[in-house]
Amino acid sequence: MEHVDSDFAPIRRSKKVVDSDKIVKAISDDLEQKNFTVLRKLNLVPIKKSVSSPKVCKPSPVKERVDHVFYQKFKSMALQELGTNYLSISYVPSLSKFLSKNLRSMKNCIVFFDKVEHIHQYAGIDRAVSETLSLVDINVVIIEMNDYLMKEGIQSSKSKECIESMGQASYSGQLDFEASEKPSNHTSDLMMMVMRKINNDESIDHIVYFKFEQLDKLSTSTIIEPSKLTEFINVLSVLEKSNNIAFKVLIYSNNVSISSLLSTSLKKKLNTKYTVFEMPILTCAQEQEYLKKMIKFTFDSGSKLLQSYNSLVTCQLNNKESNLAIFFEFLKVFPHPFTYLFNAYTEIIVQSRTFDELLDKIRNRLTIKNYPHSAYNFKKNQRLPLKLTRKVHDR
């Protein structure tokens, strides 16, 4: 209750206190007789906090209960925008233009994404690539290269997982090699099977998308099997001469040795030109700005709920003693600030059953103790859960 001076001086100084039972009875009679005399009087009379108080109380606005279904919609849209903001790679120069033009064309290309410092950068680019290729009308085949190029190799049980396809159902069915042909122990054999099947149908254009990622700085180039790399280059050489197949080789790397090895080998043996995108190194101030944008939503600018939410977040960030501001201060020195904030904030939104509970958790519950970073796995070479990445064939 907010206390204000009243213009009703005689009432303010009155020592008489009305019995609450009499008020209830008077209102009941008033409603029964439908003349509303008492209710009109009550609306005009200021109410004192106590008999001796020199001030009267001004009632606070009554909080409207947020409809459960309406809040669930708000919650769903908030989670969706949080995920989109987390995976945003808008700060990578010329990337959108490259994806929309070069990657969608049938022209062969080799692309290096270097200095990928954070998991969210890898996932963001990967999703952008998937979205771009999902708009291509021709058939797209995805081949994961990590298991193939590593020394350990792959087992026959994994052969089926190495290739995904988006496009015509008849072609997708042919990719189940374990059911139709002898299982392969090597991805190179598996790739050549794909090439033979594709070449048998020259009426269809295809893009074969090879993906390799190594985000661990500490790994050395010796993890790449030289013979496998030679085999892979031979496959690409065959594809260079094909009329109805284009290949896209995308390499996500935070390892100078691996980037150098692959770059030198591919450049020496192939005619295809390659493109290098270096991830910009954000300053601490830029990083904080992106983190703040990540939790400020814009999905419905006219929504009172959204206005209340954004107002609270802004106030909390501006108050250096608030839990949210302290949490952000910790993110300045944490190696994976985007992923940590995303994980903790996702939990807060998911766990909140009401809008008031969401605001309360942001004010009072968002702490390192309540959402410890030890609960999350931040290994740089670990890929994000499938729910955070869109596969090409998911429309």
Swiss-Prot record:
GO MF assignments: telomeric DNA binding
Keywords: Chromosome, Nucleus, Telomere
Sections of the chain in a coiled coil: none
Subcellular location: Nucleus; Chromosome, Telomere
BP terms from Gene Ontology: telomere capping; telomere maintenance; telomere maintenance via telomerase
InterPro entries assigned: RIF2_ASCE (IPR049044), RIF2_lid (IPR049045)
Signal peptide span: none
Any one of the GO CC terms: chromosome, telomeric region
Predominant location: nucleus
Note: Present with 589 molecules/cell in log phase SD medium.
General function of this protein: Involved in transcriptional silencing and telomere length regulation. Its role in telomere length regulation results from either a block in elongation or promoting degradation of the telomere ends. Loss of RIF1 function results in derepression of an HMR silencer, whose ARS consensus element has been deleted, and in the elongation of telomeres. RAP1 may target the binding of RIF1 to silencers and telomeres.
Record's subunit section: Interacts with RIF1 and RAP1 C-terminus.
Protein name, per record: Protein RIF2
Source organism per UniProt: Saccharomyces cerevisiae (strain ATCC 204508 / S288c)
